[in-house]
Protein backbone atom coordinates (compact mmCIF):
# COMPACT_ATOMS: atom_id res chain seq x y z
CA UNK A 1 0.00 0.00 0.00
CA UNK A 2 1.26 3.51 -0.84
CA UNK A 3 0.89 6.22 1.77
CA UNK A 4 0.15 9.63 0.27
CA UNK A 5 -0.25 12.86 2.21
CA UNK A 6 -1.41 16.30 1.14
CA UNK A 7 1.30 18.96 1.28
CA UNK A 8 0.45 22.50 2.38
CA UNK A 9 -3.16 22.20 1.23
CA UNK A 10 -2.15 23.04 -2.32
CA UNK A 11 -3.26 19.78 -3.85
CA UNK A 12 0.29 18.47 -4.00
CA UNK A 13 0.82 15.08 -2.43
CA UNK A 14 4.02 13.14 -1.82
CA UNK A 15 4.22 9.42 -1.16
CA UNK A 16 6.80 7.78 1.04
CA UNK A 17 8.87 7.28 -2.14
CA UNK A 18 8.75 11.06 -2.75
CA UNK A 19 6.57 10.68 -5.85
CA UNK A 20 4.75 13.92 -6.53
CA UNK A 21 1.02 13.67 -7.11
CA UNK A 22 -0.69 16.94 -8.02
CA UNK A 23 -4.44 17.48 -7.72
CA UNK A 24 -4.67 21.30 -7.82
CA UNK A 25 -5.78 21.35 -11.46
CA UNK A 26 -8.69 19.02 -10.85
CA UNK A 27 -9.45 20.58 -7.46
CA UNK A 28 -9.61 24.13 -8.81
CA UNK A 29 -10.67 23.68 -12.45
CA UNK A 30 -12.34 20.27 -12.45
CA UNK A 31 -15.22 20.23 -14.90
CA UNK A 32 -14.49 23.76 -16.17
CA UNK A 33 -11.19 22.90 -17.90
CA UNK A 34 -10.59 19.16 -17.58
CA UNK A 35 -7.95 18.97 -20.31
CA UNK A 36 -5.86 21.74 -18.73
CA UNK A 37 -6.29 20.07 -15.32
CA UNK A 38 -5.02 16.81 -16.82
CA UNK A 39 -1.93 18.50 -18.32
CA UNK A 40 -1.25 20.33 -15.04
CA UNK A 41 -1.70 17.38 -12.69
CA UNK A 42 -0.68 14.39 -14.79
CA UNK A 43 1.88 15.73 -17.26
CA UNK A 44 3.56 18.78 -15.69
CA UNK A 45 3.59 17.60 -12.09
CA UNK A 46 3.05 13.90 -12.70
CA UNK A 47 5.45 12.98 -15.48
CA UNK A 48 7.78 15.99 -15.56
CA UNK A 49 8.36 16.51 -11.83
CA UNK A 50 8.70 12.76 -11.25
CA UNK A 51 11.26 12.30 -14.04
CA UNK A 52 14.40 11.11 -12.29
CA UNK A 53 16.89 12.56 -14.79
CA UNK A 54 17.06 15.72 -12.65
CA UNK A 55 16.79 15.69 -8.85
CA UNK A 56 14.07 17.73 -7.13
CA UNK A 57 16.51 20.32 -5.76
CA UNK A 58 17.85 21.11 -9.24
CA UNK A 59 14.34 21.04 -10.72
CA UNK A 60 13.21 23.52 -8.06
CA UNK A 61 16.09 25.89 -8.86
CA UNK A 62 15.28 25.73 -12.58
CA UNK A 63 11.61 26.44 -11.88
CA UNK A 64 12.36 29.40 -9.62
CA UNK A 65 14.64 30.93 -12.27
CA UNK A 66 12.12 30.32 -15.06
CA UNK A 67 9.27 31.94 -13.12
CA UNK A 68 11.47 34.82 -11.98
CA UNK A 69 12.61 35.49 -15.55
CA UNK A 70 8.96 35.84 -16.57
CA UNK A 71 8.32 38.29 -13.76
CA UNK A 72 5.81 35.89 -12.23
CA UNK A 73 5.90 36.60 -8.51
CA UNK A 74 2.41 35.54 -7.47
CA UNK A 75 1.30 32.73 -5.16
CA UNK A 76 2.62 30.09 -7.58
CA UNK A 77 6.11 31.61 -7.34
CA UNK A 78 5.91 31.60 -3.55
CA UNK A 79 4.74 27.97 -3.68
CA UNK A 80 7.78 27.04 -5.80
CA UNK A 81 10.09 28.89 -3.38
CA UNK A 82 8.56 26.87 -0.54
CA UNK A 83 9.11 23.69 -2.55
CA UNK A 84 12.71 24.72 -3.23
CA UNK A 85 13.27 25.12 0.51
CA UNK A 86 11.64 21.73 1.19
CA UNK A 87 13.74 20.19 -1.59
CA UNK A 88 16.99 21.27 0.08
CA UNK A 89 17.77 24.65 -1.50
CA UNK A 90 19.34 26.69 1.29
CA UNK A 91 18.87 30.41 1.91
CA UNK A 92 22.43 31.03 0.75
CA UNK A 93 21.83 29.03 -2.45
CA UNK A 94 18.50 30.72 -3.30
CA UNK A 95 20.12 34.14 -2.76
CA UNK A 96 22.97 33.20 -5.10
CA UNK A 97 20.56 31.77 -7.68
CA UNK A 98 18.39 34.90 -7.72
CA UNK A 99 21.46 37.16 -7.83
CA UNK A 100 22.94 35.22 -10.75
CA UNK A 101 19.62 35.17 -12.62
CA UNK A 102 19.19 38.93 -12.07
CA UNK A 103 21.94 39.63 -14.61
CA UNK A 104 20.04 37.67 -17.27
CA UNK A 105 16.40 38.34 -16.45
CA UNK A 106 16.46 41.81 -14.94
CA UNK A 107 17.15 43.60 -11.68
CA UNK A 108 13.51 44.56 -10.90
CA UNK A 109 12.48 40.91 -11.29
CA UNK A 110 15.19 39.92 -8.83
CA UNK A 111 13.98 42.49 -6.31
CA UNK A 112 10.47 41.06 -6.56
CA UNK A 113 11.82 37.51 -6.22
CA UNK A 114 13.92 38.47 -3.20
CA UNK A 115 10.91 39.94 -1.40
CA UNK A 116 9.13 36.58 -1.58
CA UNK A 117 12.26 34.49 -1.00
CA UNK A 118 13.03 36.46 2.17
CA UNK A 119 9.48 35.87 3.39
CA UNK A 120 9.71 32.12 2.70
CA UNK A 121 13.17 31.58 4.10
CA UNK A 122 12.64 33.68 7.24
CA UNK A 123 9.49 31.78 8.21
Feature annotation, model-predicted:
Residues 89, 93:
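Winged helix-turn-helix DNA-binding recognition segment
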Residues 2-58, 78, 82, 86, ...:
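Acidic, glycine/proline-rich low-complexity segments that act as flexible tails and inter-domain linkers
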Residues 95-114:
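C-terminal structural segments of small proteins and small subunits
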Residues 70-71, 86:
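Short, solvent-exposed interaction modules
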Residues 73-76, 107:
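Short loop/beta submotifs within extracellular cysteine-rich repeat domains
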Residues 46-47, 65-69, 101-104:
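Alpha-helix C-capping/helix-to-loop hinge sites
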Residues 59-67, 97-98:
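Short, structured motif recognition centered on aromatic/hydrophobic residues
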Residues 77, 94:
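Aromatic/hydrophobic pocket-lining residues that form the small-molecule binding cavity
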